[in-house]
């Protein structure tokens, strides 16, 4: 029984003898790297990089479910890549919005101090 299941997996059109298996397997490193970047400050993250990862993850997730044979392994890794990218983009945007608010408040305080000094 185990042997038959392994043989079916080994000879599958998206099995380990094909790029359809190894490309998604290697793509998990991008997902893990993105998860590792959760510990980094959004100040040091690239919005373009994570927007690209989010977009490609979403596009290739859909593609993996349309082609024959359906590649659920590829769809899964790309789905998680899109999620990681979206979370990082949202972190970056929140950080940028906070920085603008802090800058605006600082400018208001400076103007207030100048007007009081005059």
From Swiss-Prot:
InterPro entries: MPC. The functional 150 kDa pyruvate import complex is a heteromer of mpc1 and mpc2. It comes from Schizosaccharomyces pombe (strain 972 / ATCC 24843) (Fission yeast). GO terms for cellular component: cytoplasm; mitochondrial inner membrane. This is Probable mitochondrial pyruvate carrier 2. It comes from the Eukaryota. One of its GO terms (biological process) is mitochondrial pyruvate transmembrane transport. The chain crosses the membrane at residues 19-35, 50-66, 72-94. The keyword Transport applies. The lineage of its organism: Eukaryota, Fungi, Dikarya, Ascomycota, Taphrinomycotina. It is found in: Mitochondrion inner membrane. Belongs to the mitochondrial pyruvate carrier (MPC) (TC 2.A.105) family. Mediates the uptake of pyruvate into mitochondria. One of its GO terms (molecular function) is pyruvate transmembrane transporter activity. It is a multi-pass membrane protein. Keywords: Membrane, Mitochondrion, Mitochondrion inner membrane, Transmembrane, Transmembrane helix, Transport.
